[in-house]
Amino acid sequence: MFSKNKHNTKFIVIACVIVVLILILFCFDFQNIQEIIETINQLTNNQNPSKNTASEMSGMRRKIIFFIFNFFGKIILASFIISFLLHIKKNAQIKRLKNKLSLWSKLSFHVSQIGEEVLNELPIGIVLIDISSQEIQWLNPYASFILKNPEINSPLTQINENMAQLISTSDTIPKTIITLKNQKFECFYKKDLSVFYLFDATEKEQIKHLFLQKTLAIAMIAFDNLAESLIRYDLSEQSQIQGEYLSALSDYIEPYESYLKQLIDDRFLLLLNRQNLDKMLENKFSILDTIRNISHKYQLKVTLSMGIACWNLSYEKLATYSQNAIELAQKRGGDQVVVNIENEKIKYFGAKIASLSKQSKVHARINAQNLVDILKKNPHCFIMGHTHTDLDALGSVIAFYKIAATIHPENNNYIILDEEKLDKSLIPVYHQLIKTESKKTLNIITTQQASKMIKDNSLIAVLDTQTKDMLNSPELLSLTPNIVVVDHHRATEEIIPSIFSYVESSASSTVELLVEVMGFLEKEVHITAFEASIMYAGILIDTNAFIYRTSSRTFEVASKLKDLGADAIEVKSWLRKDFDKVLEINKLISEMEIFMDRFAIIQSSEIYENRSFLAQVAESVLNIQNVDAAFMIAKIADNKIAISARSYNEINVQTIMEQMEGGGHLNSAATQLEGTNIKTVTDTLKHFLKLEYEKGEKNMEIILLTDISNKGKKHEIIKVNNGYGNFLIQNKKALLADKANLAVIKQTQILEQEQKRNHELLMQKLKQEIDDKKITLDIQLGPKGKIYGKITLKQISEEFLKVHNITLDRKKISLESEIIAIGIYPVDVFLTDQIKATFFLNVTERKSK
């Protein structure tokens, strides 16, 4: 391009010079023209022609003829010169084009060679498909090799399912990681060309995996109720029992290459990496069962709680996440492990017994005082419960309103209730409440009214739930930062941020907590008999008639409500089932399925808008002998399916429902799912039940793809039960030990052994290059010959690279002792477990300038 512009510039300069010369020549002709014109003017003005005039006329004709020939001659000359220049330019252009064509011919040959090499020689897999049939149309040799020589027109789904799934993704450039012949490949799909590109990403994925395995995890460990449980024992017995707990914990931690530090008597800090954390996850934290067995031995209510966080964050943030995790575990009742891993959903393990009550009169009084202080500072209080409001939610809302009204009798407290969001079974009771006491007495307002009244300094009280999605009016939370939460459900990771929370998962109900608070107020709280009946009904429903989560505190609160006028007969009438419901329940029970000889699963494709009906069905099934848990699965809307779960004894339906995006209590839980169907939900439920409770099944043989604690090493063939084996296979930690997989593993082992031999040969060669080499470091000495500062491994490796052009991994360099004086020191480099190279470091004094 530059050459072409330079040539054009030369041509323009020459053309300009020629034009200037022509103009100069024409300037001389201009003088002749002036003379001719003057002669004509003289002849015209001459009145007496003479002989001289005739001669002048003759001379003028000669001048005119000369001028014409001269003028046109110059024009012809100029035209010739211009034509000649144009011809030269054209020839130059033709020559340039010929040169370009020649160059392009040479380049095209090389480009063709390069393209052919890219397609056939470089380790880049290329697969062209027919987008309509999703069949392979062409693939290069490398792709053919790694895909095991598929035939043309083979369906892509038969070759690799992950590649087939990329076609339907909405990403701009869809990509995924696929495993072929024990190698990892990064697979890109170009939609406009219908072509796949495969790049070997084995090393990159190995580095990522290694980095992931070394990620730090911090665990906070606490013994629940340890101090309280040991009070009745003398000092020596306390030491013996506590020592048994600590020994069990220490024995459990020892195989995991971790660091355990006792902070206080019942609290510990554990440091480990992701690799060992994964082993704990596979083991499902058996320490929980061990601690539970020790407690059973001594008849103690002591359990273990752990909160684990594993993120690539600063130590401070990671410790905060770990602290939040153990707080969540204890809010959920203890006896469990909460694991928070980066980019993964929070996992829960354990919780096989009901929440242990940690509540005391002192604890209740402190919470009551904190709540009173907050209410005194915030005179405008807005109170709400969860959507599909039930009797416990309504009872707790009324109880909190009465507490707030006692502290601030100025009528600045409001109950937020939308009738359309009430549970259908509650509507008759709500209408009776309005008829008995009127909306004005209780200051009942709607969500729309509340949105116009709540200010930045107002207080919102959230009762009987901690989850924003479950709230009656979640949109109101953004109107003020002043939020308090009182609840008895086990906490989840999606709790509502609050300035104060009173959560006691061992309590029977939220009503129980609030009625206890009333006993610590300076003034007496006025509650009508009808309000007391609603609160009593809330406790009755949440405990299933005082069966679940019932303690002496529960009976104390129930007794107090009876004293306030609660009518048990009226409450019983509210809870009666109508005739049609009884028939429907019996019909559903007659069609139920008994799964694993202990779980009852009831399914219905009918739509039941009343969610409490599903709970009634599940509770009715529990009355059947040998049924440990019941799951009622049905639609509650066109595109929404609900499960109501109830259980006895050690069956924890809460953890099962949490795996299906729900939650609840140990023996009472539920979930709601959208965009699915009854069959899929049922299959998912069975899958989780099998994983958790399947035992004694026939064994299956599997090939381990990684080391698994207490099971075996990588590539080892072991026998496990079907449930655990399928779990390992699904998580890509094992393969079924069939002929095909055994052959693949055998070939892989051969390749790995070959790679190991090659690596050892390479390290032996590197050892020879390193051995007996010398480097020198000049350092500054103090007055007494001591070294200023410290010689680091980084300095040593950098100097070795500078002198010998060999890069050493600082982590593999070892010094026999710290360098504190000048001299010659041997430096070891551990290239492998078996190969060690040694060079010498000469430490000399830096000479002052």
Curated annotation (Swiss-Prot):
Q: What is a single Pfam family found in this protein's UniProt entry?
A: GGDEF_GdpP
State any single GO MF term: rRNA binding
Per the entry, what this protein does is:
Binds to the 23S rRNA.
- UniProt GO BP: translation
Protein name in the entry? Membrane protein-large ribosomal subunit bL9 fusion protein
Give the membrane topology, semicolon-separated if more than one: Multi-pass membrane protein
Q: Where is this region: Large ribosomal subunit protein bL9?
A: 681-849
Cited SUPFAM superfamilies: DHH phosphoesterases, L9 N-domain-like, Ribosomal protein L9 C-domain
Relay the record's extra comment. Answer: The large N-terminal domain has 2 potential transmembrane regions and a GGDEF domain.
- Which keywords appear in this protein's UniProt record, sorted alphabetically? Cell membrane, Membrane, Ribonucleoprotein, Ribosomal protein, RNA-binding, rRNA-binding, Transmembrane, Transmembrane helix
NCBIfam families in the record: L9 (TIGR00158), PRK14538.1 (NF011110)
Q: Where does the record place the region Unknown?
A: 1-680
User: Domain of life of the organism in this record?
Assistant: Bacteria
Domain GGDEF residues, every copy: 214-342
Name the principal localization, coarsely classed: membrane
Family annotation (SMART domains): GGDEF
Q: Which InterPro entries match?
A: DDH_dom, DHH_sf, DHHA1_dom, GdpP-like_PAS, GGDEF_dom, Oligoribo/pAp-PDE_c-di-AMP_PDE, Ribosomal_bL9/RNase_H1_N, Ribosomal_bL9_bac/chp
Question: Transmembrane residues, as ranges?
Answer: 11-31, 64-84
To which species is this protein native? Aster yellows witches'-broom phytoplasma (strain AYWB)
Cellular compartments annotated:
Cell membrane
Q: What's the family?
A: Belongs to the bacterial ribosomal protein bL9 family.
A Gene Ontology CC term for this entry?
ribosome
Q: Where is the signal peptide?
A: none
